Design a protein with these regions (language model features):
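Substrate-binding pocket helix/loop in short-chain dehydrogenase/reductase
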Residues: 32-34, 38-43
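The beta1-alpha1 cofactor-binding region of Rossmann-like NAD(H)/NADP(H)-dependent oxidoreductases
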Residues: 1-6, 39
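Residue(s) in the substrate-gating loop at a strand-loop-helix junction
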Residues: 77
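C-terminal helical subdomain
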Residues: 117-121, 137-184
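Active-site-adjacent segment of SDR/Rossmann-fold oxidoreductases
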Residues: 82, 103-113
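Active-site loop immediately N-terminal to the catalytic Tyr-X3-Lys motif
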Residues: 35, 84-88
Length: 190
């Protein structure tokens, strides 16, 4: 985590004030019952999805507090709301993102810092290819038979929450594909 600290400090030195922090790094590894998870996969998800997000925030937040302004946007997932089979660890990490964001909002309530959690559903990116350790065929099946969200949809959501007036704080935004009812309740065309 020392590298995270160094990178964040370099950013603060080069740009001065960070007005918007988007904690977007996240991954899932595997889709298996908890007892069958590879330890490395489990620890990598915790390190990336929870510890990495917290450490970046820890480095950037003090400058926001000093300036009494900023917006922290943390990428959660519908998996953090609706756990599904084979994703106990991933779901837990994304639930942690939501709970951390809520706590951070409470800790900064006396400031003009906003904290938003965006919780996307199924988005067609390289996420599934990473989850299945590079297996492109397995990853492609995740998106078959439905019109998944696209990265641009999530980028537009980020822009939307940042463009609100000072008096408006969007605490949570959940975005799902039209054929998605919960994290893994998805209608697929045959």
């Amino acid at each position: 985590m020392e590298m995270v600290k160094d990178v964040c400090q370099d950013i603060l030195k080069s740009v001065g004030q960070v007005h918007v922090l988007v904690n977007n790094a996240g991954l899932a590894l595997g889709l298996t019952a908890y007892q069958d998870y590879e330890e490395w996969d489990l620890l990598t998800m915790l390190d990336t999805n929870v510890k990495g997000l917290m450490m970046v925030t820890r480095q950037i937040l003090p400058s926001m507090v000093a300036a009494n302004e900023g917006h922290i946007i943390n990428m959660g997932s519908t998996a953090g709301i609706y756990a599904y089979a084979g994703a106990a660890v991933y779901s837990a990490t994304k639930a942690a993102v939501k709970t951390f964001s809520d706590g951070l909002r409470i800790d900064t309530i006396a400031t003009d810092i906003k904290v938003t959690t965006i919780q996307p559903g199924i988005v067609e990116t390289d996420f599934s290819q990473v989850r299945f350790h590079g297996d492109k065929d397995k990853a492609a099946k995740v998106y078959q038979g439905l019109e998944a969200l696209q990265a641009q949809d999530i980028a537009e959501a980020v822009l939307y929450v940042t463009k609100q007036p000072r008096r408006v704080q969007i605490s949570d935004m959940t975005i799902m594909a039209n054929q998605q009812a919960t994290g893994f309740t998805i209608h697929r065309e045959e």
